[in-house]
């Protein structure tokens, strides 16, 4: 039995039409194959060099967990990159219309959390779903968290969600 479902920065509609989608759709659908050879060549680097490259790429993060670095090293695998890019290309093609029927059927169990500067699901999407479902638990981030919060704000997000779900957790 599902008590609650939390949709964080939900990419549930019009992905290819979002600002980031307009940029990424051609790359993901047509040019993704061009990345396979460079990734294949980088896969031969020693693990320490890969970790250094990841740290360099993530240097702008305010905090970066060692787990983010360890996980990001998987991006040097051709199989991993091929699967990621294929899945992302399919999302651009298939995630088009919001499933309002399913949302309406489960509205009392859903929490939506939208970002103010999210280029994957812009604030316009928040405004529209809030208008369509005024009784829903649909929130707009006031903390400036970004879509890729797992890279630098996972603890902050976890604490926030724990607060939201406190009543549900006492029922278990």
What would you call each of these model-derived segments?
Residues 16-21, 124-125, 153:
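Short aromatic-enriched loop/helix-cap "lid" or pocket-rim segments at secondary-structure transitions
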Residues 12-14, 117-119, 146-147:
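Short, solvent-exposed loop/turn segments at secondary-structure junctions
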Residues 79-131:
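Conserved serine/cysteine hydrolase catalytic core
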Residues 29-36, 101-105, 163-172:
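Eukaryotic N-terminal low-complexity, Ser/Thr- and Lys/Arg-rich leader segments
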Residues 25-56:
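Membrane-proximal basic amphipathic "stem/tether" segments
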Residues 44-86, 97-98:
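Conserved alpha/beta-hydrolase catalytic His-Asp/Glu region
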Residues 108, 127, 131-172:
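Catalytic active-site module of serine/aspartate enzymes centered on a nucleophile-bearing elbow/loop
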Residues 2-37:
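Flexible "cap/lid" loop of the alpha/beta hydrolase fold
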């Amino acid at each position: 039995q599902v008590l609650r479902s939390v949709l964080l920065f939900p990419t549930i509609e019009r992905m290819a039409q979002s600002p980031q989608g307009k940029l990424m759709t051609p790359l993901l659908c047509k040019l993704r194959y061009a990345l396979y050879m460079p990734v294949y060549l980088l896969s031969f680097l020693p693990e320490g060099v890969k970790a250094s490259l990841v740290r360099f790429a993530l240097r702008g993060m305010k905090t970066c967990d060692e787990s983010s670095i360890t996980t990001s090293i998987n991006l040097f695998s051709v199989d991993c990159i091929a699967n990621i890019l294929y899945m992302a290309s399919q999302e651009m093609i298939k995630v088009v219309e919001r499933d309002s029927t399913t949302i309406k059927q489960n509205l009392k169990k859903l929490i939506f959390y939208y970002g103010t500067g999210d280029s994957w699901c812009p604030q316009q999407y928040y405004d529209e779903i809030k208008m369509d479902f005024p009784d829903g638990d649909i929130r707009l981030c006031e903390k400036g968290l970004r879509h890729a919060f797992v890279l630098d704000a996972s603890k902050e997000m976890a604490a926030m969600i724990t607060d939201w779900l406190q009543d549900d957790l006492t029922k278990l």
